[in-house]
Amino acid sequence: MDLSRINTWKSKQLKSFLSSKDAFKADINGHSVLYYAIADNNVRLVCTLLNAGALKNLLDNEFPLHQAATLEDTKIVKILLFSGMDDSQFDDKGNTALYYAVDSGNMQTVKLFVKKNWRLMFYGKTGWKTSFYHAVMLNDVSIVSYFLSEIPSPFDLAILLSCIHTTIKNGHVDMMILLLDYMTSTNTNSLLFIPDIKLAIDNKDIEMLQALFKYDINIYSVNLENVLLDDAEIAKMIIEKHVEYKSDSYTKDLDDVKNNKLDEIISKNEELRLMYVNCVRKNY
């Protein structure tokens, strides 16, 4: 039987069908009647099916809450949650319903889940399958910004650093700024601990580097000799930051600033020495 047109059935036909023993079995397409009701965003039919026992007869391959999370309207999600569906359940792909709300960009549905349980954004069978990381990967600044606003206390720094690494790799400047601003405002124990800049340097992503260099970024975390000799614009940015660190009373005595090969590299190259001198003059 094909149930794909059940949304057009008359009430008498629907009532007769729901009283049959096959009411909640899969049709020829492998779907249940509830699947089609949700797909059509038919709130009334969904309520009828729930009252008839649809949630007690779910197919193994169907996840109504996950499906409803892809809809722009939040009504069916609210109904399913009120009916007792588990918002932390993983589907057969290892994702939560919130993951699909994020995937669809449905901010109102995202808010609905997070207000109920903010920890859902970090639920996933792996760290890469969480709703938070998925929003970062999608470069959805609005959703990530909302997520950050709903976290009551700073979360795992390793997760945050991994997300920042991803934004640098993908060249997502606005997302990187959002995450770095959050990190610097909530983490006070890691001066010059911002993720390494190698990815941005390798990609010659000047826009990303310009954004990164506004923070206390660790310019000493990679081998900079080839960089300094290969790209004049990036070399100038690195030297300017180095001079800034050496002249700042807060950073000049840090081991990373004092014990590095940057000054030696600069001293051996006339062009780099000139850049350095100009930077020093500009700082005084």
Curated annotation (Swiss-Prot):
It comes from the Viruses. GO terms for cellular component: host cell cytoplasm; host cell nucleus. The keyword Repeat applies. Coiled coil: none annotated. Belongs to the orthopoxvirus OPG039 family. The lineage of its organism: Viruses, Varidnaviria, Bamfordvirae, Nucleocytoviricota, Pokkesviricetes. One of its GO terms (biological process) is symbiont-mediated suppression of host NF-kappaB cascade. It is found in: Host cytoplasm; Host nucleus. Its main location: host cell. InterPro entries: Ankyrin_rpt, Ankyrin_rpt-contain_sf. ANK repeats lie at residues 29-58, 60-89, 93-122, 127-157, 159-188, 192-221. PANTHER family: ANKYRIN REPEAT AND PROTEIN KINASE DOMAIN-CONTAINING PROTEIN, ANKYRIN REPEAT-CONTAINING PROTEIN-RELATED. Induction: Expressed in the early phase of the viral replicative cycle. Inhibits antiviral activity induced by type I interferons. Does not block signal transduction of IFN, but is important to counter the host antiviral state induced by a pre-treatment with IFN. Plays a role in the inhibition of host NF-kappa-B activation by preventing the acetylation of the RELA/p65 subunit of NF-kappaB. This is Interferon antagonist OPG039. Keywords: ANK repeat, Early protein, Host cytoplasm, Host nucleus, Host-virus interaction, Inhibition of host innate immune response by virus, Inhibition of host NF-kappa-B by virus, Repeat, Viral immunoevasion.
